[in-house]
Amino acid sequence: MLLWSPEGLHGAHPDRAVRQRTADYLVALVHFAEALGAGVMILGSPKARTAISPLTPAESAQMWLETLEPALKVCEVTGIQILLEPLPETDVVQTLREAVALVEQVNHPFLRTMLDVKSTLAESPDVPTLIRRYAPYIAHVHLNDANLRAPGYGTTDFSPILQALQLVGYTGWASLKPFDYFPSPTTFPLQK
């Protein structure tokens, strides 16, 4: 949502005015998600949360949470859940472990995390164990291979991942999230 535009937004910026604009934008996105009938809003956006000097990643994570507070208040009315997406491309919340720690710290009923297979593989090759460990916190799943392609177009074995999700009783959405549409955007969904 914040990855490429609008320009000038950052949830952990040292400038309070930038954080306020970002907070206002997140509130607007919650209302937009409600209008669409969405149940969740995934907050990935590594460029909009990476630590900016002189802040450390830990300090930035705390600022990021403060920036989320107004949106979480609106979530109490709309029922939208905000999901922190762990991303190794940033230095703020790279792993499920870190995301769950922040979710536990905030202890808000509308703040959870999600599982992105590609990103989780950077944390551990044993994704099923992480699913079992963090199941109560996972409210959405992105299915993508470590090579950025769709399941079946790389070396990741999705069978144990899907079995673990079933074992823990996961009933939420799972979306395909390839970044490389090999062999082509029009043919990859029709193959395999």
Task: Give the ranges of each region predicted by the language model.
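Active-site acidic/histidine proton-transfer and metal-coordination neighborhood
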Residues: L9-T113, S124
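Short, flexible segments with low predicted structural confidence
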Residues: W4-S5, K73-C75, Y137, D145
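Residue-level detector of alpha-helix boundaries and kinks
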Residues: E7, T56, L84-L87, S119, ...
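A cross-family glycoside hydrolase active-site/sugar-binding cleft signature
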Residues: M1-W4, I42-G44, L83-L87, M114-D116, ...
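Histidine-acidic metal/acid-base catalytic patches
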Residues: G37, V93-L115, T120-K192
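Conserved radical SAM core fold
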Residues: W4-H10, K47-A51, L143-R149, Y181-P183
